[in-house]
Amino acid sequence: IYRGLFGQMTAALWPLALAGIALALVLLGLRRRLPALADQGAAMLLATAFLASAWFFFFGVYRTINFAAVYPGWAFVAQAGLLLLAAVVAVFATGPSRWGNAASPLTRLVAALVVLYGLFGHPAAELATGREAASLEWFALAPDPTALVALGFLASWRSRWRYALSLVPVIWLAASALTLYGLEMQTEALCLALAMLVGLVALVLPRQTAFEFARSEEAHDGTATRRAPPRPGEAPRIPGRIKAAGGEALLPTTRRQ
């Protein structure tokens, strides 16, 4: 019965899931060059996904078999509100404190893998464990992949908001893994728990400082400052040499007689 709920929801709302997956991939690719814009867009996308999951799953199909479904549903609504607030704050953030530029390359890689797992790995794991294709869970509709994708995006943020914004996804993923285990879906429960743990590791990995990030970007793009070699017949330039009045070259330690 529980698996059938996702089939009902996906059959009616699959365009919403398709649009959410496409936007998540675009934002994931955009983050390399425009991290602040990508993170702001991710916050807005995740807010929409949590709101859709609350409305269509918790307040919709799940409530028909479990009246207590409204409680996690309201938690998802609150999460959507916090994500929208975070997106608004990001608009006015400036300077080194602005979002997103400081996740290390390792953190960005692990976070991206968690996002991709939520988008494609989670439904693939369900298919591999014998679930019918029509009842697979997809991002922006089902709560599990939505929480996984959120955890992946949040893990790549520099802002300390990522800890507070990760509470609802982590609590839901832990509760869902226990629910799946209780329903004798041990393999699905194990995959979900492992994905959550990987996301938590990425969440707590050290961040780069703004200076470290700038240095890593220079090394990656090959834009680090290099001194041009002297031209033929030209004396090599000595760092620190200055010109005195009358055109005479002096070193900083030289005193004019």
Tell where the protein language model's regions lie, with residue ranges.
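N-terminal topogenic module of multi-pass integral membrane proteins
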Residues: I1-R63
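Hydrophobic cores of alpha-helical transmembrane segments in multi-pass inner/ER membrane proteins
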Residues: W14-V26, A75-V91, P143-S156, C191-P206
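Membrane-interface capping segments at transmembrane-helix boundaries
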Residues: R32, V91-P96, V204-E218
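Membrane-interfacial loop-to-transmembrane alpha-helix junctions, especially the N-terminal start
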Residues: A36-A47, A103-A111, R158-P169
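Aromatic-anchored segments of alpha-helical transmembrane domains
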Residues: T48-F56, V114-A124, P169-Y181
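Membrane-helix boundary connector in multi-pass membrane proteins
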Residues: R63-I65, A155-L167, A174-A189
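Membrane-proximal helix-loop-helix units in multi-pass membrane proteins
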Residues: A68-A150
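Loop-to-transmembrane alpha-helix initiation sites
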Residues: A68-G73, G182-M196
